[in-house]
């Protein structure tokens, strides 16, 4: 049986299809005559760029794809398509990529059911003619170079129809010059001279007149890509990083070294010795204390959404652990939970953590990533600034204990104005956005333009706003040395009771 497979590659705005072909058995399908001319000018251009395999006794060319494919993932997985050839004969195609099977079926009842189901997708003029072939079922296999070219024409046409249904073609492309030599499928599968060599790959690039085509943006596609790829936030990069490899690299862009946002769980894993994390107050929640009114959605519903999305109950995780064997108390804010905004539960969890560290004489580390106080709780969220600052005063001034504040991007608003800037040592990450009020708020309030980079960590470091700028890679070692410098040492087997 002839084997075929497809891979889709999305790279730098271009869609490339790669088709690999290999032969193993002799089989061929009866010819389907190509007697009519496609009225679609775009399709005509496509046919011009595909080798004419006139000597082939078995081929499909100009096959229309009648069933719209909703998702590009369906094309490279097992699926059934409804097509018609230039003689208006209709067939269903079953494409099994795993077992490398390509089957044709012209069963009338099945086609009628498909036509009825997909009627809304296509013009009824496509559905006027029945199948003229008496054979109910075919296996389409490669035989020789001529048949190969017929197969290639058929696959080319299927891909053409699929791309036309999935890709938005710019009006300037559609109205391009008739003298254009490049169709949006500029390379054909048959290769030079129409000969397909065994084991060779061929590229199909979606481009016309040098202009790239763009994929339709659907919420499902965007959600899928967000789960696989992360775009760099640096204005000079915007590179795309594979999510799985990015996690192993501490969420640092592989292309420019920019420090991307991290989930609180990843930061805890980065900072704490494995197996030593002990969370605190995980079940602490609050309701809607001021019954905040919103035209968009209820405050409670919004909290429920972020709880499901992040798996957290609030915008911070607090607990205890060991830093290279040194017991510490640590709190890590999570920007993915409503922008890391501070509300009553966040303030209460931080306050309880500080009090626990005070009573147990533990060094304290707070990792800040927040947009400020949460407006949905009004003054109740603002009062957390004073409550946390009061607890820190007792911890630092009365007990003389050691507190390290780590400012990540972004750290703004009430967090900056309270515990974010109260550390004995204040550490910032590279390129972190640190401010009290955001750039847009300042410009709208003062009616003045804020210079670019004036709220970046590197600029503020030279103004003396904090102590060191420490990348993520050596951060754990730096924290360990600072804690030991202030009189906290690792536990040993003799001190454990």
From Swiss-Prot:
EC number(s) stated in the UniProt entry for this protein: 2.1.3.15
Residue stretches of biased makeup (Basic and acidic residues): 40-50
Catalytic activity: N(6)-carboxybiotinyl-L-lysyl-[protein] + acetyl-CoA = N(6)-biotinyl-L-lysyl-[protein] + malonyl-CoA
GO terms classed as biological process: fatty acid biosynthetic process; malonyl-CoA biosynthetic process
Known partners and oligomeric status: Acetyl-CoA carboxylase is a heterohexamer composed of biotin carboxyl carrier protein, biotin carboxylase and 2 subunits each of ACCase subunit alpha and ACCase plastid-coded subunit beta (accD).
Known role: Component of the acetyl coenzyme A carboxylase (ACC) complex. Biotin carboxylase (BC) catalyzes the carboxylation of biotin on its carrier protein (BCCP) and then the CO(2) group is transferred by the transcarboxylase to acetyl-CoA to form malonyl-CoA.
Keywords recorded for this protein, A-Z: ATP-binding, Chloroplast, Fatty acid biosynthesis, Fatty acid metabolism, Lipid biosynthesis, Lipid metabolism, Metal-binding, Nucleotide-binding, Plastid, Transferase, Zinc, Zinc-finger
Required cofactor(s): Zn(2+)
InterPro entries documented for this protein: AcCoA_carboxyl_beta, Acetyl_CoA_COase_Trfase_b_su, ClpP/crotonase-like_dom_sf, COA_CT_N
Annotated metabolic or biological route of this protein: Lipid metabolism; malonyl-CoA biosynthesis; malonyl-CoA from acetyl-CoA: step 1/1
Family affiliation: Belongs to the AccD/PCCB family.
UniProt keyword Cell division present: no
PROSITE patterns given in the database record: COA_CT_NTER
Predominant subcellular localization, coarse grouping: plastid
Binding site for Zn(2+): 232, 237, 253, 256
GO cellular component entries: acetyl-CoA carboxylase complex; chloroplast stroma
Zinc finger (C4-type): 232-256
Domain of life, source organism: Eukaryota
Subcellular location: Plastid, Chloroplast stroma
GO MF annotation terms: acetyl-CoA carboxylase activity; ATP binding; carboxyl- or carbamoyltransferase activity; zinc ion binding
CoA carboxyltransferase N-terminal domain location: 230-497
Protein name from the UniProt record: Acetyl-coenzyme A carboxylase carboxyl transferase subunit beta, chloroplastic
